[in-house]
Amino acid sequence: MPKMKSVKGAVKRFKVKKSGKIKRGTAYRSHILTKVDGKHHRQMRSSKHVDTVDAKNIKEMIN
């Protein structure tokens, strides 16, 4: 049986760390950020981890 192809959109959006957790970017950062207060804007810079519920599906898409 042939290997499953990875979902290229998921490969570009997620990275698997050494610990096995999946790193993702923050949503709502594209435009119209003048209305967002400075604290929230700074917090959106940092990357987040994917929830454990979604991690299994994302790992299947990446591999």
Swiss-Prot record:
Gene3D superfamilies: 4.10.410.60. GO terms for cellular component: cytosolic large ribosomal subunit. One of its GO terms (biological process) is translation. PROSITE patterns: RIBOSOMAL_L35 (PS00936). InterPro entries: Ribosomal_bL35, Ribosomal_bL35-like, Ribosomal_bL35_CS, Ribosomal_bL35_sf. One of its GO terms (molecular function) is structural constituent of ribosome. It comes from the Bacteria. Keywords: Ribonucleoprotein, Ribosomal protein. Coiled coil: none annotated. Belongs to the bacterial ribosomal protein bL35 family. This is Large ribosomal subunit protein bL35. It comes from Sulfurovum sp. (strain NBC37-1).
